[in-house]
């Protein structure tokens, strides 16, 4: 196994035993990126000098000492571009570190570069980036998912040992599933949002994308914790997630299967893979019980009312006056605002701003926005009732595997449905984990989702860890080319 193929845990063992130096690790990874990234375009910015310099000063005794981490382009890193893959933020340099970056630095991590994304995190394919399209390492004719597609593609292609993404409606979990990675959306308030460029403030959450569940637990442990700069941050002790993975008794564990998530329209191979996952847990002694989340059918509509309403307010701050792109030819201030935003925002961002402004308008506020808030509470109540019968839920992460580039761009509704199984988790503010469970006959990764109650990340992490441990999961090396023959799972046969 080559150095860049290692998990964070394996890399840390070599670093601690001084079998490899942080400088060698960074140099090895930069070589891998130079070789591979022209094929998939996961990174939009690399700071070679800073990474190499940091590697020479790395403190191996720290939890992430010497480990390079990739960062999604909507998370502020002092002195680096933070353009959110948008033209309107061209030339903008972050004037401060976000809280998660401060925590990574204190843990000894080396910041490697910034990954591509859908503009302002609005999208499910990373096709909405103003910088260029990221491709799926398993088939470069396919999307990596979104909006954290660059982070997922980088980890899957072994261009990063781990990465940070953000998840507003599935933007960590869906690309993780499409690329064959582990993606964790923490409970809302577990991880500080300070320094994350806001899309929908009541739904956004930063989380890790990794090669293994063990690595996700370690990163969550590092980035979690109360932050006075984020008024939605909860003042709770941070569990030792990485130490709570082992020795979890499964004898009395009940895993709920929401019937609303196993509907017509799910790809047959996804359904088959999920059936095998359920069967595997049953063999481990887990009790499987069907549950109902009756308001699930309303989740997508509810999400796109609330998220776009918040986006229209949050993105009003970008006008080109203090920083970023600005129109050069205009007649007056109103004309300036219009032209700057028209030139700076992409079509999907404009669509969502228009929709959000519409649902907040005086004639429709009660009919749409207030009603959506009520449905959001109903969805949250559904999960609370379900968790009275079980400790976690198991669902598909996505109803299908990665789709072809350009396949859904002309039909926004079809694109929005890519997140149909992930959106409700954000509306409820709870935690969820996407784990690879196989590959299709075309060689495309399939993922399943474990959903846990608020503040119970250790439950789903332990359940995911047991799955990977008992199936012998080893992060595979993708072909980085066109269509390949697939079939068979990584750990379980299909």
Curated annotation (Swiss-Prot):
GO molecular function, one term: glutaminyl-tRNA synthase (glutamine-hydrolyzing) activity
GO cellular component: glutamyl-tRNA(Gln) amidotransferase complex
Enzyme Commission number, as recorded: 6.3.5.7
Listed SUPFAM superfamilies: Amidase signature (AS) enzymes
UniProt superkingdom: Bacteria
Class in the EC hierarchy, top level: ligase
GO biological process terms on file: translation
Keyword line: ATP-binding, Ligase, Nucleotide-binding, Protein biosynthesis
Active site residues according to the UniProt entry: 72, 147, 171
InterPro entries: Amidase, Amidase_CS, Amidase_dom, AS_sf, GatA
Coiled coil: none
Function (record text): Allows the formation of correctly charged Gln-tRNA(Gln) through the transamidation of misacylated Glu-tRNA(Gln) in organisms which lack glutaminyl-tRNA synthetase. The reaction takes place in the presence of glutamine and ATP through an activated gamma-phospho-Glu-tRNA(Gln).
PANTHER family the UniProt entry points to: GLUTAMYL-TRNA(GLN) AMIDOTRANSFERASE SUBUNIT A, TRANSAMIDASE
Assembly, per entry: Heterotrimer of A, B and C subunits.
Protein family: Belongs to the amidase family. GatA subfamily.
HAMAP family in the record: GatA
Listed name of the protein: Glutamyl-tRNA(Gln) amidotransferase subunit A
Organism, scientific name: Methylacidiphilum infernorum (isolate V4) (Methylokorus infernorum (strain V4))
